[in-house]
Amino acid sequence: SASPSRPEAPAEAAPSAPAEKAPAAEGPAEEKPAEEKLVATYAVTAFTQDSIRYDVSSGDAVVTGCADSVTKLVIPETVTYDDKEYKVVGIQEHAFDWANHRSLALETVDLGGLPLEIGEYAFRGQKSLTTVTGMDNITAVSDYMFTACSALTSVADLSKVTSVGIQAFMNCSSLTTLEGLNFSALTSIGQQAFNNMKSFSLELGEHTFDSLEFLDIRAFANTAGITGKVVLPERI
């Protein structure tokens, strides 16, 4: 007899594909920061005001020269540029040196009674320069400051000077007056400081250089107008 037929196994259902995730809802777009505009700024280091040149790189003003047309130089206490005020604190070395400014012909200089630091050779060889005033708060006449200013007749207000540098007044052949200079207060006199001042005369009497600590060679050479008996401290 025929064998009973086996029931067919139910067909396996094909595995269903995983459900696709719905894309996440997009949030508000991030705002990009506004682009910064670069603005170039430049620090002022030098400028010219009223025909006088200044360096202000240190934060204060130092005089570095002037226009060749200037004959009467007056140093101000302060100077303003681009809405900023600077205190005038000094005069740069060689600022008015004839060797660097051969067309400049200064006649008078007024330092305004300011406590300036004045560099070497500041006025050397200014052959038209006749008078210098306003040195009330200057304590040192720097090396070669007035060397060969042959028309210079008077330097005033030297009462606070304690140091006269190398050749400071050498070959100032017309100089007759160093107003207020107290030789008793000088602590240092440089080499040839007063050499060849042919028009200068000073009667010292019996004079002691009480404060003097340094006296270099030929300090008073060829300056016959200084007379008297000079007494030097034993430490010299």
Model-inferred region functions:
Residues 1-4:
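Sec-dependent N-terminal signal peptides
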Residues 15-54:
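N-terminal low-complexity, Pro/Thr/Ser-rich intrinsically disordered segments
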Residues 93-95, 119-122, 142-147, 165-170, ...:
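Consensus positions within tandem repeat domains that build extended binding/scaffold surfaces
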